[in-house]
Amino acid sequence: SYTLRALKSGESTDISGLYADWAEALEWQSGQLSIQYNSTDGTGWIGWYDGETQWCLSAGDGADAPLVNTAYSIMQTLGYDVDVAPEGASDVVYSAEPRDGLAVASCAFTLDGVRWTYSMAATSQVELPFQDISGLPDYAVTEDAQILWCPAVISYDESGAGKITWFDVAPGLVYSLSADNSAGRDALLDMANRLFTPAQGEVG
């Protein structure tokens, strides 16, 4: 079961009413929303704060869908612009997990028979080389690339499976985009440019 709460507030705050030693405790940004996620084996809560209102969705035992994905559906219903999947995408799933010390928020979707995963994480590391948050090994071919003004690394193989990672230094955000098959270098670059919305707006 789920419980949804809301509170007018001057700052982000925990309104879940739940207290535990959580296995996962993550925070990240999605557009203008500050998001907090605390979970153990799928039970826990996710909160989002828009500068005026704190929302919180909590899940108990037996919740019938992943908590993060359910919360993103509610955010969209409430009118928040958090949908990063392109038009025509299907099987869209939102998730969050700790990875190499960072809180990685991801959106997986299927488009034209290819399964894509787009991820983002905030980092305090500003020097190169930047962190790879894809969770995937390098493929047969690895090259330097660029997404807008951001340094990028692209890696792929003959089947079209691959990944591209990039770093936007001003807001301190690292990104990754991966494809399971039939994509290749050009498709990875095209999709990355299509999905990437700079946190600071267009620059230069």
Indicate residue ranges for each PLM-predicted region.
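Short, solvent-exposed recognition patches
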Residues: 1-51, 81-173
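Surface-exposed amphipathic alpha-helical segments
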Residues: 51-84, 171-204
